[in-house]
Amino acid sequence: MLTMFKVEIVQLPKKVLRQKSKNVNIPLNKTNIELAEKMIYHIDDSQGPNTKFRPGVGVAAVQYGILKNVFYVCVPNDSRLTQRDSSQEVKPEDKYLFRDVIFNPEVIWKSDEMVAISQGEGCLSVDESWPNQEGLVRRHMEIKVKGYSYFQKKEMIWHVKGYVAIVFQHELDHLNGMLFIDRIDPKRLWDKSGIKVL
């Protein structure tokens, strides 16, 4: 049933990626429910063995050209992630470190401690051939975000750490018209001073 969704990712240099998104009304209408289901279908399928999509762990509505404050994060409980990220408290039976569509997300707290992924970040909206993608992307190690949970059908606050916090901040940037390449400092591309590297 979910395969009816047509997925077209907006990529640089499209200007919509540089625009700020706007909050949506709660309760969700049919259009926003369909948007959430499209995001779930797209990213979940992208993590499968026979996917036609570029693999991803998150997507923001603006990446479909839709300026709405909503993103989906689906981070599998992958031993390659958890072994290098000791901040995650993961039970072996948990399939995901995090999985939900969040509407109207707002950061209400962030840690002073900073973190980055050792090989840098990537993005579905930034083609792999786009220049100046190499370098550490500095993020807050922990953040608290409030918003509306699609799966729980209520307002919630999430306290996320490590890799999941990085993914959250990557998607939150999209909602503010920013991309990960904006956060790479060309003067210290791989400088690890003052940050934890995963």
Swiss-Prot record:
Active-site residues, as the UniProt record annotates them: 171
Entries under Pfam families matching the protein: Pep_deformylase
Reaction equation(s) it catalyzes: N-terminal N-formyl-L-methionyl-[peptide] + H2O = N-terminal L-methionyl-[peptide] + formate
GO biological process, one term: translation
Protein name: Peptide deformylase
Taxonomic placement: Bacteria, Bacillati, Mycoplasmatota, Mycoplasmoidales, Metamycoplasmataceae
InterPro entries: Peptide_deformylase (IPR023635), Peptide_deformylase_sf (IPR036821)
Stated role: Removes the formyl group from the N-terminal Met of newly synthesized proteins. Requires at least a dipeptide for an efficient rate of reaction. N-terminal L-methionine is a prerequisite for activity but the enzyme has broad specificity at other positions.
Required co-factors: Fe(2+)
Gene that produces this protein: def
Enzyme class: hydrolase
Tagged with keyword Hydrolase: yes
